[in-house]
């Protein structure tokens, strides 16, 4: 059987040797050149390939059409990936009739993503393993050919566990590869509900937070000890690295980070204490804990912790245009919870952000972006991060007021983009899931999916193309003039304060608010085209946490990125959303304040939205970028979001009803 191999690291060497032992006809080996900045403790795939007299390549982009064509010419029957660090394109995977298989260092679907060996230790797991699975478009998500379990001991480090995983990979491949030569193996689909994802780790992730338990900190130490950069803390400005430690079940009344003793060197944690067995100080020598204390002048009752800043760092100034809107007010709440941020906001109303008006870190001006251009330009110049959240984003307006949509969503926002270029300010721009249009991919990918819209006479696409054109303009400014930007694409965020019932009364609201209005007023719930359209609903708190991490932008990780923010597991049709709402409504404690349910009513989209409307059957995000870049995973189930959103609007409706007679008397 002819095979193409993509491999790196020790596991890559194991995989290559296992294929050779099993008698595979290896046509070519693709690997990576060594990174001089990486502590390379593992064997070389290139050397193993050379010893086996195999052709070996290390292209910068193996998915380039030239390399795809060269692989096509080799006519592989099967493709293997063993710790190769780049995703292989669908085009490459389609070249092998038997498909492509990847060896992953965990028991999938748990610990998808990067650095699974380090992560299982950080999280204190007692078992892991290796998985051979078929490669699909979504990373680490394909059906499983086989697994081999590995026990994790209390004293395992990343290096010792790596050795166990290497042996496990060898055993798994010795079992599976000969059978795969005889014919396709039965594959077991992964359970998405059990999946977890962990992103890339950096040296900075080794910083110790002493308020955590001694057990948790010790897990970090063994996860990142040699050959990795190590867990570290600071004594004033001086850094110390911990190579080996031991958690102690010790009761104390000291603040976390306080040195309890120097021989042995023991530090108070949020729960228990940590004995530092070996480490290094600024001299760089590997020494015992008590010697480390002597070298660094550590004494009892001194505190270890974060490196103090030499200068008083001012707060990051965030300008939010449309601060009173759904995303704007929730984002403001999250930013003001962190004393690193100061928020400047503009909007035509203030009902949703009135709760922040007394906060000294919040500055608000009531105004219209089309009128207050001088105020906006001044504050773009003054602030650090700019979020232009002002837009018409309700579907009925796309056909009812297409020119107004274009003028506000494109023309006014283009001015803001150009001011960001002019003053060299970072822009975090709200793109939209609408830009994907009628994309035919199973999951909409920021980097590869086609953006497909309808004909010109379908005016509903004016919002989509206005946003898409701004995305392209921002990208071009980034490439040509160095604009710092991040584009984020929300997928059906919902929660309290999404639109309001007055907007729903004139049809200018999102789906859930419109459905709630029907329940509140006792009118039939109108299901456009039967409500068969599916969407992935995302809780506002999940969405805001991702957006907060984009604004935070650790190590510039979000610069020049496009990031979908959605929850693929919360997919439901509009009819299913309506039924879920109805169930929660009937069980709500305020149910008696509202009329009887008037039933469902199917209605054609043209009758509801008018001529020029065209709908999309489904809209499912790929969130690999959010997981990889932000280390973010949506957590809140749709039922919880629906319940909280309904509760917010029902309580608001009751207050509105009880206030009405007073208003009439005052009149």
Swiss-Prot record:
It comes from the Bacteria. The active site is at residues 104, 434, 619. One of its GO terms (cellular component) is membrane. Bifunctional enzyme that catalyzes the oxidative decarboxylation of UDP-glucuronic acid (UDP-GlcUA) to UDP-4-keto-arabinose (UDP-Ara4O) and the addition of a formyl group to UDP-4-amino-4-deoxy-L-arabinose (UDP-L-Ara4N) to form UDP-L-4-formamido-arabinose (UDP-L-Ara4FN). The modified arabinose is attached to lipid A and is required for resistance to polymyxin and cationic antimicrobial peptides. This is Bifunctional polymyxin resistance protein ArnA. In the N-terminal section; belongs to the Fmt family. UDP-L-Ara4N formyltransferase subfamily. Pfam families: Epimerase, Formyl_trans_C, Formyl_trans_N. UDP-alpha-D-glucuronate binds at residues 393, 398, 432-433, 460, 492, 526-535, 613. Its EC number is 2.1.2.13, 1.1.1.305. Residues 314-667 are annotated as: Dehydrogenase ArnADH.
